[in-house]
């Protein structure tokens, strides 16, 4: 599908995504938060690695419960990806229960992510059980407006991860 048709069909894609999110959300609040973050991903410009509506729909196409996380750290700290992945791990919890993972990294244009920095992320993703039907979709966007984010009174540039995880419903 070309870009023109993709954009024209976006409202239909969003409605399908909204239905999927509603089905796996534990509450209306989680559903709304997830949709707000998904819209940020879909509408992000200057993406280095793109997540499109089809990627989002595929990652949400499973049974379970949706966990929504928006994690932000100072983009100037040493080992920033290690710190960010550590924060994600704290929020997600037990990797064995994660069936599907969608995450999008936002980084300041003036402090771009280097390939060499992504090793902690790669190590973390490899910790998921490969014999399961685990799905992962990810993207990255450079942004020039990162000091405006919530709870950022110091106006420092931020490294941010939007993480949507579908976890198993074990009783």
Regions found by a protein language model. Give the residues of each.
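Tubulin/FtsZ superfamily GTPase core signature
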Residues: 1-171
């Amino acid at each position: 599908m070309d870009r023109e048709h993709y954009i024209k069909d976006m409202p239909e894609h969003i409605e399908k995504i909204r239905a999927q999110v509603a089905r796996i959300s534990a509450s209306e609040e989680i559903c709304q938060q997830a949709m707000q973050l998904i819209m940020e991903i879909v509408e992000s410009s200057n993406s280095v690695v793109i997540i499109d509506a089809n990627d989002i729909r595929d990652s949400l196409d499973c049974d379970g419960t949706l966990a929504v996380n928006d994690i932000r750290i100072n983009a100037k700290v040493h080992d920033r990806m290690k710190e960010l992945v550590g924060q994600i791990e704290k929020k997600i919890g037990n990797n064995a229960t994660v069936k599907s993972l969608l995450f999008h990294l936002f980084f300041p244009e003036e402090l771009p992510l280097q390939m060499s920095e992504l090793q902690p992320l790669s190590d973390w993703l490899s910790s998921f059980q490969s014999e399961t039907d685990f799905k992962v979709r990810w993207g990255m966007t450079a942004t020039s407006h990162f000091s405006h984010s919530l709870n950022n009174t110091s106006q420092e540039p931020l490294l941010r991860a939007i993480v949507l995880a579908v976890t198993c419903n074990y009783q």
